[in-house]
Structure formats: structure tokens, C-alpha cells
Amino acid sequence: MIAELKGVGKEYQVGDQTIIALHPLDLSIKTGELTLIIGPSGSGKTTLLSLLGCVIYPTQGKLFVNDQLVNDMNQKQLAHLRLNTIGFVFQSFNLITPLNALDNVMMPLQLKKINAKDAKTQAEAALNLVGMLDRKKSLPKQLSGGQQQRVAIARALVTDPKLILCDEPTASLDASSIATIMEELVSLSKSGKSVCVVTHDPRLLNYADRVIKVENGFATEIKKNELTNAFTLV
């Protein structure tokens, strides 16, 4: 188990009003599984992902990531946990446009102060894993959307994280690119990593080991035998 939420909830104070972004829930993210987090826009999906990614603190309950209690950590400790345990893949790729694919993938290693030679070797290995080594010198603008996302996945993998969090990783991609990206994420989960994918796209349901539905700030697990009408769930 890589992450555990015990009665975890998240609220925001806006003036005199309390906004409940996520009602308290119990949830475990298991090793070697691909967990899909589904629900409409504004349902609380991104809040849940932000909690798992140690980007925000819970306002209720206890959050454990890699057997460490997140509630008690300061910002420096959180940054260290994220850098060494978690890989992030974003909808907008978040590649640095003046840098080529290899330099983009090397960025997290530079933050860890890995020497240049070792960083290059590790970055090339990550690009090779996603089938993009032959495009290592390409700038983001020279790559298709699917190729940019594969570079983003390589960047998330390069530090060998235990948990990979993906926020709408297939949005705006064509069907072929969606299949490629999801097959790579499934392969990563089968290699022993925990993968969580936030989406509102029911086409991704078939790739999941587990499905968490978030609606109006409430999160519940959907059983496999309840997925036949997938399009009614989101």
C-alpha cells in the first residue's frame, strides 16, 4: 500500500462560508494497481489527487503516503516526499518549451542534484521505456500531443517513483494516442507501481483495476460488476 486516507476530508474557508471540496473518506491506494478516479467537473477529483500528491493538507483525518503521516510534515518535508516518491503527469504536458525532450526529462534529476552523466543515462532510459528515445533532441513543438504526453510520462518515471498521479492525461488526444498512453500506464502498474488517473472519459474504464467515483465531494468505490453502464457514472 502506497497511500492511505483515514477519514480524510478537505474544506476551504471563503469569507464566512465553508466550502466542502471533499467529504471525509477512507481509501487505500494499493501497490501494482491502476486506480481510475472518475466524476464530472467540479466533483472533487482534483482535490483528491492533490491530497494524494501531497500538494495540499487535509483539514480532517489522517493522510499517509509511503508510510509517512503527511499531516505533520512541513513544506520542505513535503517537497522531499513528492520528489522521491511521486511522479506527476498533467493534462497540459507542462513541458518546458525551449528544452528538448531529453532536457525536460532530466529536470527532476537536476532537482535531486544527480550528476549530469548519470542524469542523462537515467533520462535516456526513461525515454526508451516510453518509446521516445529516438526523439530525445526534439523540442515540444516538434512533437504530437501523444508524443509530448509520453515525454511527460518519462519525466514522471525518471526518479523511479512508487506512485504516479495523472490528471486527465488523455484529454485532447486522439483515440490511437489514448490507447498508447493508457497501455503504458497499465504496464507501469503491472511492474509494481501504483498509478492513479483522474478522468471524466468513460473510455478509460476498461484499463482500471479499481474505480473511484467522486460526485459532489463524496468519493465511493465502484465495483467491477457495476461498470456495465459506464457512461452513466460520469
What is the role of each PLM region?
Residues V211-K224:
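H-loop (His-switch) and adjacent beta-strand-loop-beta switch element
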Residues I2-A3, V8-L25, I29-Y207, V211-V214:
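ABC family nucleotide-binding domain
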Residues M1-E11, E221-V234:
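ABC-family P-loop ATPase nucleotide-binding domain
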